[in-house]
Amino acid sequence: MTLNEKKSINECDLKGKKVLIRVDFNVPVKNGKITNDYRIRSALPTLKKVLTEGGSCVLMSHLGRPKGIPMAQAGKIRSTGGVPGFQQKATLKPVAKALSELLLRPVTFAPDCLNAADVVSKMSPGDVVLLENVRFYKEEGSKKAKDREAMAKILASYGDVYISDAFGTAHRDSATMTGIPKILGNGAAGYLMEKEISYFAKVLGNPPRPLVAIVGGAKVSDKIQLLDNMLQRIDYLLIGGAMAYTFLKAQGYSIGKSKCEESKLEFARSLLKKAEDRKVQVILPIDHVCHTEFKAVDSPLITEDQNIPEGHMALDIGPKTIEKYVQTIGKCKSAIWNGPMGVFEMVPYSKGTFAIAKAMGRGTHEHGLMSIIGGGDSASAAELSGEAKRMSHVSTGGGASLELLEGKTLPGVTVLDEKSAVVSYASAGTGTLSNRWSSL
């Protein structure tokens, strides 16, 4: 199976159908207010397609990592008329309100996802129901297939067609991602899922060359499989974040008290040798922004070269490194970014990460760079920098995108029906998809 062989929502008969849509509304909520609605807005093209075609939407999502209860204890939810008090932070109720405002139509909130048959039975074409957080029940993510199936059977009874638009959880084998489509015998990708699949199919297939991977984050161990897999596909590799110091130490540089995974030094040496053999140019930081403690200060130390003084820890890439990385991105026609360059949450150490975001945004806007942000912290940084809207694609799935880049298959994609006619990588590009996303 290649990524882009999956059935599209465009192939589904939606008229008069109750359409079960697995969305990813796992958004940040503070004091009952949504602080970033990007994931909700990302689902709008799919929802509008169903509603325009004369269907109704039954939406399923999770929010956070609540401590779920077994289905056998469902009375705990039903006796209170909704979510127990200790779970209030994970309720999807604020999302229903936000979605209603975005869709300009009522959204009915069902306070118990497994006790919504009555609400769903009264739906008419054009109606939208949002079920409460599916993770309030343990069976959603149970390791036991029979438990997942038991929950999926109830949810599957609410609809006629299953659409998956939750790329962010596509790496999960769960009741709502894999259980329901197995029961209904039909499953198609929504527009967000299609867009995600399209871009990753291109970067993992035949991307415009040269292709640069910018990889950062805290641990080499978190990115071993990604680095191994991508080394077969890229022309340049830029390494930043705390993981860079393991590579620098492996080359004999002083790293002060910067983070280092001693157990991964040999892997770092091996990867650098492998890159050399494959003629992949690996570029490591040539200067650093440092301090003696892990805290923000007005005037952090900027090193002259790769070496970090004793008693100091590097917290961002330095200005010379920024210049070199930006120049490298400027040479390329495709770029994939996974992981920040420094502790970008602290202003003194955000310049490296934001410079990468700006270089990718500018390259996309001015020179047609195909730029893909692999979700997670990189997506947050792209948003904070103001560059997200200029990127070709900002993934909604940190974990899912990481697993794809590692060369793994995603259960939530594999389970979907096959396309009636397989399209090529070239035709899986932005095309008409970009038009659906221009207003987001």
From Swiss-Prot:
- Family indicated by similarity: Belongs to the phosphoglycerate kinase family.
Q: Kindly give the CDD domains that the UniProt entry links to this protein.
A: Phosphoglycerate_kinase
Q: What are the protein's GO molecular function terms?
A: ADP binding; ATP binding; metal ion binding; phosphoglycerate kinase activity
> Where does it localize?
Glycosome
In which residues is AMP bound?
A218, K219, K223, A242, A314, E345
* Essential cofactor(s): Mg(2+)
Fill in the misc note: In T.brucei, three genes code for phosphoglycerate kinase isozymes, which are transported to different cell compartments.
Q: Where does ATP bind?
A: A218, A242, A314, D377, S378
Q: Can you name the source organism?
A: Trypanosoma brucei brucei
Where do the annotations place CDP binding? Answer: G217, D222, G241, G339, F344
Per UniProt, where does (2R)-3-phosphoglycerate bind? V23, D24, F25, N26, R39, S61, H62, G64, R65, R135, H171, R172, K219
Q: What is the name attached to this protein's record?
A: Phosphoglycerate kinase, glycosomal
Q: What does UniProt give as GO cellular component?
A: cytosol; glycosome
